[in-house]
């Protein structure tokens, strides 16, 4: 029996994630397998959860959150047979946008349930893989300030 894991970051982005478990449950109820849900508790937790899921032979790990959550999960799945699914719920959702994943949760989950898979490239900087963007100088300073900010949304960039 196939196993699927949704890793939900409860503090990513600005939108509510209350409907996500039900939407995922509906989409994966017809799948030949079982869906498990878990929530992150701190930075780095998604990577740990995803790594464990890959080791246990999960078919797919679904990152529900922003680029940080997606990067953590994707890093853990590198070199495994476990697929990465994305439900964008962050402030920027850069990787999801570049892959054509819907920003609407219901539509993104519908896209996941089609079973379509693609391979994506990764890059490594200072021994750390990443999947969407990399910046230096001012770009990196803005990214760092955003990561340290207590609020989320586009206004945080100003």
Regions found by a protein language model. Name each.
Residues 1-61:
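ATP/NTP phosphate-donor binding region
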Residues 17, 72-74, 96-97, 141:
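Short glycine-/acidic-enriched loop or helix-start segments at secondary-structure transitions
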Residues 64, 71, 113:
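Structural signature of FAD isoalloxazine-binding scaffolds in flavoprotein oxidoreductases
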Residues 69-82:
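Short Gly/Thr/Asp-enriched flexible loops that form oxyanion-binding sites at enzyme active sites
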């Amino acid at each position: 029996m196939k196993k699927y894991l949704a890793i939900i970051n409860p503090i990513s982005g600005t939108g509510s994630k209350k409907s996500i478990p039900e939407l995922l449950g509906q989409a994966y109820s017809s799948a030949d397998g079982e869906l498990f849900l878990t929530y992150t508790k701190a930075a780095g937790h998604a990577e740990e959860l995803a790594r464990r899921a890959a080791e246990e032979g999960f078919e797919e790990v679904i990152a529900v959150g922003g680029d940080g959550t997606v990067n953590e999960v994707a890093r853990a799945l590198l070199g495994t047979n476990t697929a990465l699914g994305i439900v964008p719920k962050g402030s920027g959702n850069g990787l999801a946008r570049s892959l054509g994943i819907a920003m609407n949760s219901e539509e993104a989950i519908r896209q996941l349930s089609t079973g379509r898979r693609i391979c994506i490239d990764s890059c490594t900087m200072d021994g750390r893989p990443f999947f969407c963007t990399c910046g230096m100088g001012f770009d990196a300073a803005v990214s760092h300030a955003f990561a340290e900010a207590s609020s989320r949304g586009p206004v945080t960039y100003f």
